[in-house]
């Protein structure tokens, strides 16, 4: 039996770095991923596709590992980086986008993430596992944003 957890997150923040510098990091998946916490391995699948293998986490007496793959596309003129899930890779489907806007004195960054995580748990565990999985993912994304903000010279 399995439990499916849906995750929808949105963030907006400003950094001191120039938009071109921000785009260069966020459009380079390995560079961007180096700021994401608890990544065990990032595997280049070719053609702009990457498989993310997260560190294993323990919840109660259960050990879980999130693995997913996404295909990335970027458009420098529009200041966008987006990714779509690759089905059949791992136990999650993750899509999202970055929108980078040059506001002269600062760079505005908007991050949106939609995910669906399938956990190998009995249905009765959903009430316990879903909020923990959501909170853990949200905590990692917030740490990722903090790490990127620091890399980009702090908040503007």
Spans of features found by a protein language model:
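Hydrophobic ligand-binding cavity/cleft-lining segments
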Residues: 1-49
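Generic structural detector for well-ordered beta-strands
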Residues: 12-16, 43, 71-73, 82, ...
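Short strand-connecting beta-turns/loops that link adjacent beta-strands
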Residues: 18, 47, 77, 103-106
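Hydrophobic/aromatic beta-strand elements that line small-molecule binding cavities or substrate pockets
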Residues: 39-40, 66-74, 94-102
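Beta-strand/loop substructures that line and gate deep hydrophobic ligand-binding cavities in soluble
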Residues: 86-139
């Amino acid at each position: 039996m399995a439990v499916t957890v849906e995750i929808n997150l949105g963030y907006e923040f400003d950094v001191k770095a120039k938009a071109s510098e921000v785009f260069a990091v966020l459009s380079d998946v390995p560079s961007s991923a180096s700021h994401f916490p608890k990544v065990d391995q990032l595997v280049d699948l070719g053609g702009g596709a990457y498989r993310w293998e997260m560190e294993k986490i323990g919840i109660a007496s259960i050990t879980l590992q999130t693995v997913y793959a996404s295909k990335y596309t970027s458009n420098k003129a529009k200041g966008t980086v987006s990714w779509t899930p690759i089905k059949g890779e791992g136990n999650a489907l993750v899509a999202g986008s970055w929108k980078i806007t040059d506001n002269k004195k600062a760079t505005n960054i908007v991050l949106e993430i939609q995910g669906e995580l399938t956990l190998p748990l009995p249905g009765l565990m959903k009430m316990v596992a879903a909020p923990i999985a959501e909170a853990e993912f949200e905590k990692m994304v917030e740490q990722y944003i903090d790490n990127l903000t620091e890399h980009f010279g702090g908040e503007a």
